[in-house]
């Protein structure tokens, strides 16, 4: 009995597989075959534009074709090549992006790991407003639960605010992929969070949420009065994800850690001119936050942390102060601390401003570079009321210069630390220019 129904069953399964084929990746063999065909194919083998699919007939259901812009004069294929596979007519409703109705079939876009913003009309020429195209692309990325890709070397002009649910999608660029806001959004440029509230399913958050993207706002003298990237919110499990190779500049607040943001890693990233801020009295926030190989610099910018434990490894802070409030604790290790090179006389690198906050600076280097003005502030500060936790400094090399002399003010000769809070210092290596600077 089973043998008699086997051919029928196979035909049924084959038909079902064809209907759903557009939602899945090509097999490796098919991808390789298509790649080889692209190398040797003449322009007649390709649909020149997406619109050509409307009149194109398939030779058989399951046929894979390439759609590209073919430059006859240069006799080359442009890089933006897409693959489409033919599906049975009426197998799925066309949407003119992923599924396009052809002459005798539905042409379904073949994608194995991401969606491309250019499929949705984004240009990336640094002039055209791509907001609507990227909004549509982001909606589809959430719908299909696939990453969204911004091609290399493109600058997308946008405005308004976007949201990224890491339980469903992520954003990734290539070399020098830029998102430039033409005007300040009302609250934030991008909010990153997770809608996955079931604790046993938070493993879906354990991913790279953002990578290889630059978020541009205003200039150094006209920062946008908004948040560039907001992390967390009312959702309970906005955690466990990472940001890598992110560049943020031109915003009053470059990063904002909201409620329910914890165990987030940020690496190989650059933050210029604006603040890094954690929400005061945040709930369920601040557990094991980690910066690795990041740079925070310029414009007297600050990081202001109010709760949680914050780890900095191999980071640089140049003309930037890490301010510790509430019960927050900071661990700065294997880093680089450097004063500003501008005409000013103030430089504090790490300051502790409450009785329950703490910080440690270990295995790091402090460089007091020459500036036109005499720097008169201590590099570290501990509030008077902090008598039990305070600041711990160990294995710090300090390259002192003649333009640094806190004794010229009411610091009264204190070399490294201001305030009367608790300080423990071990293994300080100082390249002394003038020994009178040491208290």
Kindly give the residue locations of the regions a language model identified.
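Short, surface-exposed terminal/edge motifs of secreted or surface/virion proteins that either
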Residues: 64-114
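N-terminal extracellular ligand-recognition/capping segment immediately after the signal peptide
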Residues: 45-51, 67-82, 142-170, 174-186, ...
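Acidic Gly/Asp/Thr-rich repetitive segments characteristic of extracellular carbohydrate-active
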Residues: 40-60, 119-150
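Right-handed parallel beta-helix/beta-spiral solenoid domain characteristic of secreted/periplasmic
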Residues: 110-133, 169-225
């Amino acid at each position: 009995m089973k043998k008699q129904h086997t051919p029928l069953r196979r035909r049924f399964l084959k038909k079902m597989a064809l209907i759903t084929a557009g939602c899945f990746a090509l097999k490796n063999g098919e991808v390789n075959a298509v790649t080889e065909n692209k190398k040797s194919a003449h322009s007649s083998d390709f649909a020149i534009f997406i619109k050509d699919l409307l009149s194109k007939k398939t030779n058989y259901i399951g046929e894979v074709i390439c759609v590209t812009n073919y430059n006859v004069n240069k006799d080359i294929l442009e890089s933006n090549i897409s693959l489409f596979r033919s599906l049975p007519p009426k197998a799925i409703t066309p949407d003119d992006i992923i599924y396009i109705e052809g002459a005798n079939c539905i042409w379904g876009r073949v994608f194995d790991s991401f969606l491309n913003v250019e499929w949705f009309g984004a240009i990336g020429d640094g002039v055209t407003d791509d907001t609507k195209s990227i909004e549509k692309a982001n909606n589809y990325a959430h719908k299909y639960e696939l990453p969204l890709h911004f091609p290399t070397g493109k600058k997308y002009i946008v405005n308004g605010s976007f949201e990224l649910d890491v339980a469903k999608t992520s954003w990734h660029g290539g070399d020098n992929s830029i998102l430039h806001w033409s005007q300040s959004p009302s609250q934030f440029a991008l909010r990153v969070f997770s809608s996955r509230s079931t604790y046993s399913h938070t493993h879906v958050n354990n991913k790279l949420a953002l990578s290889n993207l630059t978020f541009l706002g205003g200039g150094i003298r006209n920062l946008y009065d908004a948040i560039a990237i907001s992390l967390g919110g009312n959702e309970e499990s906005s955690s466990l994800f990472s940001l890598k190779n992110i560049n943020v500049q031109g915003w009053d607040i470059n990063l904002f850690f909201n409620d329910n943001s914890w165990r987030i890693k940020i690496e190989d990233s650059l933050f210029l001119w604006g603040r890094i801020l954690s929400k005061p009295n945040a709930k369920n926030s601040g557990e094991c936050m980690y910066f690795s190989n990041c740079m925070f610099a310029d414009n007297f910018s600050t990081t202001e942390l109010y709760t949680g434990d914050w780890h900095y490894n191999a980071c640089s802070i140049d003309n930037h102060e890490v301010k510790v409030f509430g019960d927050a604790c900071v661990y700065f290790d294997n880093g680089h601390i450097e004063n500003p090179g501008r005409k000013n006389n103030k430089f504090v690198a790490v300051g502790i401003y409450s009785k329950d906050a703490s910080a440690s600076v270990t295995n790091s280097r402090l460089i007091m570079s020459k500036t036109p003005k005499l720097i008169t502030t201590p590099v570290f500060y501990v509030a008077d009321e902090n008598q039990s936790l305070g600041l711990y400094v160990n294995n710090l090399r300090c390259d002192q210069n003649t333009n640094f002399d806190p004794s010229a003010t009411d610091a009264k000769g204190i070399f490294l630390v201001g305030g009367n809070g608790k300080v423990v210092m071990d293994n300080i290596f100082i390249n002394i220019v003038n020994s009178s600077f040491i208290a």
